[in-house]
Amino acid sequence: MHASPLRTLASIALAALLSCTAHAKPNILVILADDLGYGELSCQGFTQQIPTPNIDSIAKNGVRFTSGYVSGPYCSPTRAGFMTGRYQQRFGHEFNPGPAEAAVENFGLPLTEKTIGDRLKAAGYATGWFGKSHLGYKPPFHPLKRGFDEFFGFLGGAHSYLDAAGDKHNPILRGTEQLPAITYTTEEFAREAVSFIGRHKAGPWFCYLPFNAVHGPLQATDKYLNRFTGITDTKRRTYCAMQSAMDDAVGTVLAKVRENGQEENTLIFFFSDNGGPTAQTTSGNGPLRGFKAQTWEGGIRIPFMMQWKGKIPAGKVDDRPVIQLDIHPTALAAARVEAPGDAKFDGVNLLPYVTGEKNGAPHDALYWRFGQQIALRSGDWKIVKGAGMDGIAGGRAGKADTAGAELYNLKDDIGEKSNLAGKNPDKLKELAALWDQWNAGNIDAAWGPGSRGKAADSAKPGEPAQPKRRKKQNN
């Protein structure tokens, strides 16, 4: 079989791309929004209420994935998935750890897991983390012990934008030292990232910038509120101001990359940790059904884009399903960092797909488990069960039996309005069996609702959770 000319050119382009990075490793910038819904960015095409030219520029200069997902509908678990490149259910990080002083404060991203920071630091990268953590409160889980040279941010799940102390258990930290005062967290995190990039101009550097925007509390300064005087709803106006501030902050960081002359040697990702929590007031999800904490599309499909100017196509829209787990192996591939054979990534290297060397789908299927809720997408088909349940409150998924399961064709029905389960029982059974096969490789939640090991009640402070391997279900 002879390769097509286009495929040959794509292979040559990818080989050249990786060849150059062998001598000059690219910088890597990962920008994470908090609770940003699928429908709020202007580049997504559903609303122009909040101009986001800087975030939009990443899509303009790179690839925007319209079927971009995260591996759960909730905050800390998807961050754990990004950090490891693995489904968080593989190591029991199914729910949020904390808050501080609660029974689950002793838990976080298991110490047995290697992070993207660990691997890039070992490869000679300067590594910096500026913003939210939410991967554990205790010292063993601190970013400075998870592969990062610098940290400026907070360890918990939510924080005041204006008060450095936040609550007494979750202050803004520089390294391990508490700051006495801040201006506005969104601006502060961007300034710290800019400083880091400036100090490491010689490269290579990895900058992780997880904003707490646009997560509550709803707080903004007059600078941003004054941009939306035509909005009468106070909450919506404040939300718009918060998102506008985040876009400005992204612009500040991107400008520093350009100032350093590093735009063509910097791989950039932007995504959100889960879907928006409400329909209109605080981050909407456009045409998608459901919200944060639900496994309908509105909870798990998110804005997702990547840029590597001059190396991957610009202005490309790609509808193939991808997931935040892919960022870790993609970054390692770009950096020519070979992960050990036991890394067991669930994510894949996206570079050959965006350059055209590979034409198929990066994933045969994507999977979700969040308490009682389950979901799977394979091609255009999606099975979902328990999406309306409160996965945070209790219960856990067993087998994906078809009773009560919903089936949708997302190509024709992105809003999940027409349940086709009754018309396609064979497809429903096929996807349920596929989910069961995936879930057999997971373990029970290490803490939180439905956790069997009762780790939250028994482990010592600072010890990683030791959840139990899932047993085969008979029901």
Annotate each PLM feature.
Residues H2, L9, A13-E406, I414-Q437, ...:
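Formylglycine-dependent sulfatase
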